[in-house]
Amino acid sequence: MTLDLPRRFPWPTLLSVAIHGAVVAGLLYTSVHQVIEKPSPSQPIEITMVAPADLEPPQAAQPVVEPVVEPEPEPEPEVVPEPPKEVPVVIHKPEPKPKPKPKPKPKPEKKVEPKREVKPAEPRPVSPFENNNTAPARTAPSTTAATAKPMTTAPSGPKALKRGDPSYPQRAQALRIEGDVRVKFDVTADGRVENIQILSAKPANMFERDVKTAMRKWRYEAGRPGTGLTMNIKFRLNGVKMD
């Protein structure tokens, strides 16, 4: 009868198994100890009140002054001298000589003819045979006879064909008022009266309207116009007169 002996394991394997077993056992012990251990009772919280005056304010951080770096001065631009300006040459033109004034032409002198002097007739010696009652000798007529000026006739003005008297205002007639009116008017080429103007009226604002109404109906001969003609119209209780 034969016995089977267990095989021998190599020692490195055994060492590895032992290390792993120790690690596993340590982990199990730690976990079990944490579960079983009771938590310690909570300790009271202490609060300390601090007065605000006791607290020192934090020191303000001093700003860091950076050194001012002065910029380098820029180089001054070179001054370029301006070229000399050309002075324009002024050419003086000769002033024109004034033209000589034309000499006035001598006026032709009128020749004055000398007047002929008429010598008086010398008396002749009286002959004893001549009659003493003879008429004296006639003197020659003067050569300077006065020239007669031609007579000019003024052209006749427009000839009136229809010129009725102005009517006497009833108010003036009732009050027995008389008056005078002086008018100025023009006569057209077809014989009508226009531009009637009252030059004077006494008394005023009494006869003027009736005078203008009558003059607008006047008619003169056509083709003989006239301007600035005047007329005096007299209002009398016994009638109206025009001149």
UniProtKB/Swiss-Prot annotation:
| Low complexity bias spans | 58-68, 134-155
Identify its membrane topology class. Single-pass membrane protein
User: What cellular component GO annotations does this protein have?
Assistant: outer membrane-bounded periplasmic space; plasma membrane protein complex
For side Cytoplasmic, which residue ranges? 1-12
Keyword annotations of the record? Cell inner membrane, Cell membrane, Membrane, Protein transport, Repeat, Signal-anchor, Transmembrane, Transmembrane helix, Transport
Membrane-spanning parts: 13-29
Q: Where is the composition biased (Acidic residues)?
A: 69-79
PROSITE patterns given in the database record? TONB_CTD
Give me the ranges of the annotated region Disordered.
Answer: 58-167
Q: Which InterPro entries match?
A: TonB (IPR003538), TonB-dependent_transducer (IPR051045), TonB/TolA_C (IPR006260), TonB_C (IPR037682), TonB_pro-rich (IPR049924)
The chain positions of domain TonB C-terminal read 153-243
Q: Where is this region: 4 X 2 AA tandem repeats of E-P?
A: 70-77
Region: 6 X 2 AA tandem repeats of K-P; residue ranges are: 97-108
- List where Basic and acidic residues composition bias occurs: 106-122
The residue stretches assigned to a coiled coil in this entry are none
Please name every pair of cysteines joined by a disulfide bond in this record: none
> Where are the Periplasmic topological domains?
30-243
One GO term in the molecular function aspect is: energy transducer activity
Family in the record: Belongs to the TonB family.
* Subunit structure comment from the entry: Homodimer. Forms a complex with the accessory proteins ExbB and ExbD.
Name the job this protein performs: Interacts with outer membrane receptor proteins that carry out high-affinity binding and energy dependent uptake into the periplasmic space of specific substrates. It could act to transduce energy from the cytoplasmic membrane to specific energy-requiring processes in the outer membrane, resulting in the release into the periplasm of ligands bound by these outer membrane proteins.
Q: What protein name is recorded for this chain?
A: Protein TonB
Native species: Klebsiella aerogenes (strain ATCC 13048 / DSM 30053 / CCUG 1429 / JCM 1235 / KCTC 2190 / NBRC 13534 / NCIMB 10102 / NCTC 10006 / CDC 819-56)
